[in-house]
Amino acid sequence: MADVHELLDTWIENVTDEELLGELKAMREAGDEDAITDAFFQELAFGTAGLRGTLGAGTNRMNIYTVGRATQGFADYLVKNFENPTVAIARDSRNKGELFVKTTAAILAANGVTSYVYPKISPVPTLSWATRYLKRSGGICMTASHNPAPYNGYKAYGPDGCQITSEAADAISAAMNACDPFKDIKTMDFDAAVEQGLVKWIDDEVLDAYYDAVADKSVNNLTDEQIANAPLKLVYTPLNGTGLIPVTTVLNKVGITDITVVPEQRDPDGDFPTCPYP
């Protein structure tokens, strides 16, 4: 890679996102060598788990440019290996998730790849489900799993709903390495992509089918009446993530309705104020 200061200058010259540009200029004006080095000493590596890193400006950060580079690499891989490729996309409650989803879908659309997007936050398993249920060529989920709040990530999935193989990851990584984030990424307006049918919304039927499938897998030898009369009480916390609706929906389906949700951790919040490591 180029010198970190050269990379900083290149990014300042090319970045159009105002928030990231402000961060870059502040770095340079402060002469913060530690911050500059940490932001640019490497590029986020793409592997079988995709990308993961802290949010911010630089090659070693999760931002629309590093996400864009990964998406262009994934698009190149899909176009090469699938006829009329399609992708399912989801995001959890982490910060910048919606921005990254729209960035990703717009780039895929510009490459001729149609995206099927969950309109609201969804847990990772629902992305795997949609990829298989809708018979898509791949899937992408914006999530950083258990990492602290400053992180986000970009997980890529194969048509089987599993994380991509090492062979696929290597091919995507090679395509990324040949991609300049400011010159080589194809993109288009997100709303235009929706209007042209290159971005479609995943409807509730897909989630309903998922909930039914999970409920059908429950191990239960009791009748509905026995379940209703059982003194079973649960305490549950979504940890400010995406689990509230899916978990309580499935529990209700199998007859468990007396559920106390921890109020401080009930609602989605990408800052995870009560749980530094969700």
Where are the regions that the model predicts?
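Basic/polar N-terminal segments that are highly enriched at the extreme N-terminus
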Residues: 1-9
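An N-terminal, well-structured beta->alpha segment
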Residues: 8-104, 111, 193, 199-234, ...
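Residues on a specific face of well-ordered alpha-helices
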Residues: 72, 102, 106, 125, ...
